[in-house]
A protein has these predicted regions:
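N-terminal presequence-like segments and the immediate start of the first folded domain
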Residues: 1-55, 59-72, 78-127
């Protein structure tokens, strides 16, 4: 098993690795909508927050020589599920190639770190 911290990756909000790799699978820790340059500072609204979360996930994957095309499963956590679900889906969908959407679970939660509106974690598979 390998524990990865990606140089230049998002600043952890708690004690964890950016990703853990075992048996060809890479488990990417849930990412927040802040940026490595502005830890703890979140943009307003689900559109900007979803974009930042996806950018952070891409950064972690790229640091491990992977991309979104290697993702087999995504889990999305929303604090305002009813209000933000449709817009989050529009932004989320824009990051994936046609016909290459991973399996996904999306749930409403009562709270996230930094009072974020969204968090996403991934499972990827090495080719």
């Amino acid at each position: 098993m390998q524990f990865h911290m990606v140089p230049g990756g998002p600043t952890p909000v708690a004690p964890f690795s950016h990703a853990v790799e075992t048996a060809g699978f890479v488990f990417v820790t849930g990412q927040m909508p802040d940026t490595p340059l502005t830890p703890g500072v979140l943009p307003e609204g689900i559109t900007a927050q979803t974009r930042n979360v996806m950018a952070n996930l891409i950064t972690v994957l790229a640091g491990l020589s992977l991309g979104l095309d290697h993702v087999v499963m995504a889990r999305v956590y929303l604090t305002r599920f009813k209000e933000d679900y449709a817009e989050m889906n529009t932004v989320y969908r824009s990051f994936w190639a046609e016909g290459r959407l991973p399996a996904r679970t999306c749930v409403g939660v009562t709270g996230l770190a930094y009072d974020a509106l969204i968090e996403v974690d991934l499972i990827a598979r090495r080719p």
